[in-house]
């Protein structure tokens, strides 16, 4: 769980650092995810017919899952746009998935560059936020690192990604 800036939320062992989680032994563990904005965005649209969590690291797989679901319309929820940042890391992800869905050229490096050059990406490069290591930025900008989508299911009051 994380709060703005990537710090671990009270009661959570980890913050919002993918690099820190790479070394964590989580096999067989239930993982509860809480981000500064992404989880709230999912909650806000919990009643959508189909809901996916997405990022550049699984963009192509997400586009394939959307296509397989036969969606006539797709709505992208941009949660990274705040008063102090442009949110282009989220917009780049949406633009990438949209280009794939439309069959348009989608050069991975163009979208990765947008993540690195976004307001939030520059915070990682600056090195002034202890819970925003540069390794996280490189992981976030690794387009199509994973070949799975993250469909979100409703289980009672909870949203679950499996």
Regions found by a protein language model. Name each.
Residues 36-39, 43-104:
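Short alpha-helices
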Residues 11-30, 34-36, 45-50, 88-162:
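Long, charged alpha-helical interface segments
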């Amino acid at each position: 769980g994380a709060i703005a800036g990537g710090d671990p939320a009270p009661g959570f062992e980890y913050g919002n650092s993918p690099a820190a989680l790479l070394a964590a032994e989580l096999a067989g563990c239930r993982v509860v995810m809480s981000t500064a904005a992404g989880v709230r965005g999912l909650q806000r649209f919990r009643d959508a017919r189909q809901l996916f969590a997405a990022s550049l690291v699984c963009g192509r797989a997400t586009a394939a899952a959307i296509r397989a679901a036969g969606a006539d319309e797709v709505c992208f929820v941009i949660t990274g746009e705040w008063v102090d940042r442009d949110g282009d890391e989220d917009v780049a992800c949406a633009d990438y998935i949209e280009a794939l869905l439309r069959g348009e050229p989608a050069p991975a490096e163009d979208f990765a560059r947008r993540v690195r050059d976004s307001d939030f990406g520059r915070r990682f490069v600056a090195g002034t936020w202890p819970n925003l290591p540069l390794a996280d930025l490189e992981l976030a900008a690794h387009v199509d690192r994973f070949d799975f989508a993250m469909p979100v299911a409703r289980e009672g009051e909870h949203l679950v990604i499996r």
